[in-house]
């Protein structure tokens, strides 16, 4: 899914400045938004072509997290939150979920675990076992999102077959204390830099709609850009009941699209993925994420909420004249062009139906 954020750009493609980004982030309506989307789409096509990568995940360990991230229903500090709670699942179950994701078109598969970091040797050993099996038994590119991991543990995971490490900055430094107080922004940077130092491909982004200003969205993008990450996952807040952010008003679809487009113009070489919250925040305009510059998205379920059936996501990609990008593992890909439907997919509890929205054009 991720190659390098330092790739050579085609002639005529240059990242925009922070000052220009702070101006364009307010282009959220009419001809200004149309022009912004067209510009982002042109950059996406010039740098990344018309391939889209899909990412699948497993919630390998859920709930009872000691952190207080205000958006997350897995925090043990929020009594009203209702995320599932269970210990680390077995390596076999992780591999089986990866096989399902691969058949659904996933290029990358991420093992996600709640908590500050993996704190038990048994948990780390389970992930190592799963990574070895993923490399041996599937074609997907293995990723992990395991919190504030340190260099020795990350090295073990890399030796077991880890290709990508995911750790979100979540938001701008100036807004971070409004989101989380139990760890610092700099602690997050330490983990990301440790993974980069080991040669792992980096995936780091955040969530929009957590009360930040448009200017702070640009600040956040500048910080991600300066880390030189390969992939930027962009989520839109889907407020979870019982969390401090459950009553936040959603940002508009136009704001979502404008932010994506600005991020593409700021980071033309990065792979930009639209992940959680796209159904709730964009509704009938989900397909416009590619016009706004994204070249990847999620397939299947999220951590604690249901996603669309895989065939709907694959169909959305294909209707835009785009094709799925296969893994770079050199192995035969299990995706045969036909993603599972709702009837075939083990979905989680139903989410509220996305609101219908008029198309932009």
Swiss-Prot record:
Protein name as it appears in the record: Biotin synthase
Family statement: Belongs to the radical SAM superfamily. Biotin synthase family.
Record organism: Anaeromyxobacter dehalogenans (strain 2CP-C)
UniProt keyword annotation of 4Fe-4S present: yes
EC number: 2.8.1.6
GO BP term, example: biotin biosynthetic process
PANTHER family the record matches: BIOTIN SYNTHASE, BIOTIN SYNTHASE, MITOCHONDRIAL
Functional description taken from the UniProt entry: Catalyzes the conversion of dethiobiotin (DTB) to biotin by the insertion of a sulfur atom into dethiobiotin via a radical-based mechanism.
Involved pathway(s): Cofactor biosynthesis; biotin biosynthesis; biotin from 7,8-diaminononanoate: step 2/2
PROSITE patterns the UniProt entry points to: RADICAL_SAM (PS51918)
HAMAP family: BioB (MF_01694)
Required co-factors: [4Fe-4S] cluster; [2Fe-2S] cluster
Binding site for [2Fe-2S] cluster: 110, 143, 203
Gene (name only): bioB
Subunit organization: Homodimer.
GO terms, molecular function: 2 iron, 2 sulfur cluster binding; 4 iron, 4 sulfur cluster binding; biotin synthase activity; iron ion binding
Domain of life, source organism: Bacteria
Binding site for [4Fe-4S] cluster: 65, 69, 72
Catalytic reaction annotation: (4R,5S)-dethiobiotin + (sulfur carrier)-SH + 2 reduced [2Fe-2S]-[ferredoxin] + 2 S-adenosyl-L-methionine = (sulfur carrier)-H + biotin + 2 5'-deoxyadenosine + 2 L-methionine + 2 oxidized [2Fe-2S]-[ferredoxin]
InterPro entries: Aldolase_TIM, BATS_dom, Biotin_synth/BioAB, Biotin_synthase, Elp3/MiaA/NifB-like_rSAM, rSAM
Cofactor: binding comment: Binds 1 [4Fe-4S] cluster. The cluster is coordinated with 3 cysteines and an exchangeable S-adenosyl-L-methionine.
